[in-house]
């Protein structure tokens, strides 16, 4: 019987391993496995954390990556946020936003609803939040002071996005809409100052920059400067997003820095319909975590390091046709739910065959 049990276990393992990777880098980007939290801190002796207004505000933002803290500058004097504010010479009462890397932004005035709108409801922030579930990714283009370089960089970004869109039918999962370019002109800096601040930009850069954002407002890699943009950096980063999660990509690239993003239950339900599973489901998160842990157990370092030799883009997605606009016929999306159903059917058949075999052996 021990021999039959061992065979049974090996068969089950083979079935689930044969199912392959269930998720793409893009899909993992929607998860909360590693979430950048922005803290909006109201530091005020008179503010009461138990006030119904603050509780309503907290509930309203439960599903996005903005958290509210009500702190008393006297009773909470040793709180890291209060100490950080004091080190910056901030006088209380004050309302500050703390980034995941502990950078601090001081607001003028204490109108919490206006501040909330500045953080999560800027024109471009709302646009991206609406687009992310339906598109491949966003190429966020920040204009610099040099108009000529701005024009050149935008041409390269648009071409790279078009090239990726041509490759999308050959990627592990089909996405209906390709990358979208969202430019930020120098005239947008005031209205988008907090979105830009979250990306580390506090003034108009000398040269244009590009950020590739996907999933739940995640950045893959780092900011791309003018030289990197003209050398195909946008294409390289976008290609990584289309790969499956076992492509050898460093975990820190798949779960990169996030911008503050308005995300609610409607966003979650809409995404679930599109990808075929709930990215916030504990079982899905456990499976994603298992895959990522396996991929990064060996050779993990403290810094982000892209190793081109671990990802053969031509082999993964097919050769890129230079200047070609042809696209392949799109195939139905290989949803994880379908893969699981097929695996369970195969498992049922195997168990039935093993059972019949054991019964036959006993009779003889």
Language-model regions, residue ranges each:
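Non-globular targeting/processing and membrane-anchoring segments
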Residues: 19-364
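Bacterial N-terminal signal peptides
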Residues: 7-15
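Bacterial N-terminal signal peptides that target proteins for export
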Residues: 1-6
């Amino acid at each position: 019987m021990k021999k039959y049990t061992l065979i049974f276990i090996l068969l089950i393992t083979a079935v689930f391993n044969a199912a392959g990777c269930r998720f793409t880098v893009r899909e993992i980007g929607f998860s909360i496995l590693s979430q950048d939290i922005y803290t909006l801190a109201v530091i005020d002796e008179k503010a009461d954390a138990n006030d119904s207004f603050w509780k309503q505000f907290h509930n309203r933002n439960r599903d996005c990556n903005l958290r509210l803290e009500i702190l008393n500058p006297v009773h909470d004097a040793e709180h890291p946020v209060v100490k950080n504010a004091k080190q910056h010479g901030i006088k209380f009462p004050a309302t500050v936003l703390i980034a995941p890397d502990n950078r601090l932004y001081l607001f003028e005035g204490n109108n919490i609803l206006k501040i909330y709108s500045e953080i999560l409801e800027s024109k471009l922030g709302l646009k991206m939040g609406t687009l992310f579930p339906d598109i491949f990714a966003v190429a966020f283009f920040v204009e610099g002071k040099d108009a000529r370089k701005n024009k050149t960089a935008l041409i390269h970004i648009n071409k790279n996005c078009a090239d990726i869109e041509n490759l999308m039918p050959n990627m592990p999962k089909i996405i209906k809409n390709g990358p979208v370019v969202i430019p930020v002109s120098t005239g947008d800096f005031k209205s988008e100052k907090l979105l830009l601040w979250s990306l580390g930009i506090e003034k108009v850069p000398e040269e244009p920059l590009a950020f590739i954002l996907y999933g739940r407002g995640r950045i893959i890699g780092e900011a791309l400067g003018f030289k990197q943009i003209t050398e195909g950096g946008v294409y390289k980063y976008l290609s990584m997003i289309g790969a499956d999660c076992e492509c050898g990509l460093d975990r820190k690239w798949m779960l990169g820095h996030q911008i503050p993003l308005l995300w609610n239950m409607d966003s979650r339900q809409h995404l679930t319909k599109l990808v075929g599973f709930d990215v916030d489901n504990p079982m899905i998160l456990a499976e994603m975590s298992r895959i990522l842990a396996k991929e990064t157990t060996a050779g993990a370092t403290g810094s982000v390091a892209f190793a081109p030799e671990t990802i053969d883009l031509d082999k993964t997605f097919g050769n890129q046709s230079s200047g070609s606009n042809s696209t392949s016929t799109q195939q139905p999306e290989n949803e994880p739910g379908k893969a699981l159903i097929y695996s369970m059917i195969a498992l049922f058949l195997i168990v039935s065959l093993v059972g019949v075999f054991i019964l036959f052996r006993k009779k003889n």
